[in-house]
């Protein structure tokens, strides 16, 4: 049998598919990250080892700001290429919706590198608006205000516009337009108004219902006409500068995007024909990320198009409609936060221990006085072959069910039950192995690999770090970061350390559809085994919750140059005291309560003075330590 190669691991985990140019495997069998073409490749295993020496423990979130920069440059370059190809005569504006990842270092990096591309920000709520208007954006950059708005929201936006910010208030509901008109008159400012249009077209994938007739936001055609009449009656026709639509996040099919663009372009044409000189078309989000690397429209975790194709269709559709009707090309706004941020963050955690289903020892023989069910099941296992495996499977299931029923009635003992279990799972393993080599195996055997998978218990919280995996079954690329020059000898699901049965990952990227287990290696004594989850830079940090009071993980910012990498910043994860404070437990009061209890216990002779001191020392140390296992 030939030796396992790096290329085999690349194919097994499809890293060349989802990793684009950022992720790969080096000659050591370690995952490497290459944020920039002219920069070095960062060895994740060596990075984790270095961070351990700095007392930065896993789980950790590693951010690569250079990848953010590259994503911005790539999107801008695609617009430049498409503009030249289709004779586009207006401007394009890349907008980052901060809801995708509101973490200050992420927003600041995007703004800092995006200034030369006129990159702007989008706020979808009042708190987000407070953050956005205080960020040092370029004077030509746009700020798009979406979401529901009250008087204080609108006043804040209008006054910021009065002081020089290029702010657009996008009307989601008719009552907002009336509120904007009243507030603008009071503040003596001519507002930049946008209107979100509810298209009949919708996206595809998990967020399909975000667009179309069932969408939460936007004005229907009838409501749009009402809004136009209102603006005309108030002498505010010139205030309508922008139309906006959104057909859903992570649109999997480019055809759906094309359909929506054609529909939206006609709104732009019709508004110009009615005397409303709209200058901007905000095509919203939807630009997807190929999480599984299949470039397939049938997978909700993939897309069947590239950034360049998305941009080409956006520009060509609007240019074509404008030219045919003799009107100016609109400035095009895109709100593609997921595509900008997903790739830049990697979650890394350690496997703590494993659990495997029991099996019969090949050298073990049954005693002459063993229960008849044990003897019968042993006979099935001992004579199992391909010709009789279906019958053997049925018989084994029947015997196991009978044994469990007898145990429940107190007829067979615990030792007999354990023997039945070991034999049953050994039979199941052998049948699965035989079936795996068949071209057409019986349907009954399809789920056996999933059933037999080991459980790898990992030091992280699914609810804190990968909420979309739990909430919407989002599939992320997951793989070990080391030993990739070795053939994996186990299959496993990943279990987190929360006290919740939902805290597990049982869907993984596969060369064929979705796998219910991941190929992994057996653990070695005194050698940490690390697993990484990739493309987690969009939504995961901000949506994570404190189930079981597991807080934010340690976070590390790593930059690269042509000579090496630099650990720019280490952000400590939350302590036990910090998460307890969130749920209104005062750490100081907790310590005082424990001190009183310990003093009382010492006086009553329940523990010694030394034991009391040791207990309090451990309590204080744990209180100000990491929420994860150390």
Swiss-Prot record:
| Record PTM N6-(pyridoxal phosphate)lysine, positions in chain | 99
Q: Where in the chain are disulfide-linked cysteines found?
A: none
InterPro entries, per the entry: Ala_racemase/Decarboxylase_C, Arg_decarb_HB, Arg_decarbox_C, Arg_decrbxlase, De-COase2_CS, De-COase2_N, De-COase2_pyr-phos_BS, Orn/DAP/Arg_de-COase
Listed under catalytic activity are: L-arginine + H(+) = agmatine + CO2
**Could you tell me which PROSITE patterns the record lists for this protein?**
ODR_DC_2_1, ODR_DC_2_2
Cofactor(s) the protein requires to work: Mg(2+); pyridoxal 5'-phosphate
Give the protein's function.
Answer: Catalyzes the biosynthesis of agmatine from arginine.
Q: Which HAMAP family match?
A: SpeA (MF_01417)
The similarity comment for this entry is: Belongs to the Orn/Lys/Arg decarboxylase class-II family. SpeA subfamily.
Q: What name does the UniProt record give this protein?
A: Biosynthetic arginine decarboxylase
């Amino acid at each position: 049998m030939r030796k396992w190669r790096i290329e085999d691991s690349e194919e097994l985990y499809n890293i060349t598919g989802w990793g684009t140019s950022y992720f790969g495997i080096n000659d050591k069998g370690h995952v490497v990250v290459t944020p920039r073409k002219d920069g070095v490749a960062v060895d994740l295993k060596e990075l984790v080892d270095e961070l351990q020496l700095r007392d930065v423990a896993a789980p950790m979130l590693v951010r690569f700001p250079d990848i953010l920069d590259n994503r911005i440059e790539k999107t801008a370059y695609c617009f430049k290429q498409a503009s030249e190809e289709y004779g586009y005569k207006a401007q394009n504006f890349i907008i980052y919706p901060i809801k995708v990842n509101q973490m200050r270092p992420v927003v600041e990096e995007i703004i800092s590198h995006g200034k030369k591309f006129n990159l702007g920000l989008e706020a979808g709520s009042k708190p987000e608006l407070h953050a956005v208007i205080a960020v040092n954006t370029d004077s030509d950059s746009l700020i798009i205000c979406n979401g529901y708005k009250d008087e204080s929201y609108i006043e804040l936006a209008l006054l910021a516009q009065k002081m020089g910010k290029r702010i657009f208030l996008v009307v989601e509901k008719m009552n907002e337009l009336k509120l904007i008109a009243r507030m603008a008159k009071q503040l003596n400012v001519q507002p930049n108004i946008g209107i979100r249009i509810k298209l009949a077209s919708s996206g595809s994938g998990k967020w399909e219902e975000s667009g179309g007739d069932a969408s939460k936001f936007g004005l229907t055609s009838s409501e749009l006409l009402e809004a136009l009449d209102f603006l005309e009656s108030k002498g505010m026709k010139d205030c309508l500068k922008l139309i906006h639509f959104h057909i859903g996040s992570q649109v999997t099919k480019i055809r759906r995007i094309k359909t929506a663009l054609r529909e939206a372009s006609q709104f732009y044409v019709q508004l110009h024909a009615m005397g409303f000189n709209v200058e901007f078309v905000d095509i919203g989000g939807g630009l997807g990320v190929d999480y599984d690397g299949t470039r397939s429209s049938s997978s909700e975790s993939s897309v069947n198009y590239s950034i360049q194709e998305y941009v080409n269709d956006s520009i060509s559709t609007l240019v074509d409609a404008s030219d045919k009707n003799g009107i100016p090309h609109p400035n095009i706004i895109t709100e593609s936060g997921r595509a900008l941020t997903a790739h830049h963050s990697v979650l890394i955690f350690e496997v703590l221990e494993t659990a495997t289903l029991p099996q019969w020892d090949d050298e073990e023989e049954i005693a002459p006085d063993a229960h008849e069910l044990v003897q019968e099941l042993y006979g099935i296992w001992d004579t199992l072959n391909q010709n009789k495996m279906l019958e053997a499977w049925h018989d084994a299931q029947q015997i196991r069910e009978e044994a469990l029923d007898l145990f429940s009635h107190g007829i067979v003992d615990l030792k007999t039950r354990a023997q039945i279990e070991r034999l049953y799972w050994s039979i199941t393993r052998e049948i699965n192995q035989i079936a795996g080599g068949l071209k057409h195996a019986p349907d009954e055997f399809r789920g056996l690999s999933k059933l037999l998978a080991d459980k790898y218990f990992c030091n992280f919280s699914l609810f804190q770090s990968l909420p979309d995996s739990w909430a919407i079954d989002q599939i992320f690329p997951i793989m070990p970061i080391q030993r990739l020059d070795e053939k994996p000898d186990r299959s496993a699901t990943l279990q987190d350390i929360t006290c919740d049965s939902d805290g597990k990952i049982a869907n993984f990227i596969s060369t064929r559809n979705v796998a219910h287990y991941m190929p992994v290696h057996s653990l070695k004594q005194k050698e940490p085994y690390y697993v990484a989850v990739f493309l987690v830079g969009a939504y995961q940090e901000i949506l994570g919750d404190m189930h079981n009071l597991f807080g934010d993980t340690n976070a590390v910012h790593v930059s690269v140059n042509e000579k090496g990498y630099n650990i720019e910043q280490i952000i400590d994860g939350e302590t036990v005291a910090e998460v307890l404070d969130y749920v209104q437990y005062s750490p100081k009061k907790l310590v005082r309560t424990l001190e009183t209890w310990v003093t009382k216990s010492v006086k009553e002779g329940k523990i010694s003075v030394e034991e009391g001191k040791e207990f309090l020392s451990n309590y204080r140390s744990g209180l100000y330590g990491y929420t994860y296992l150390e």
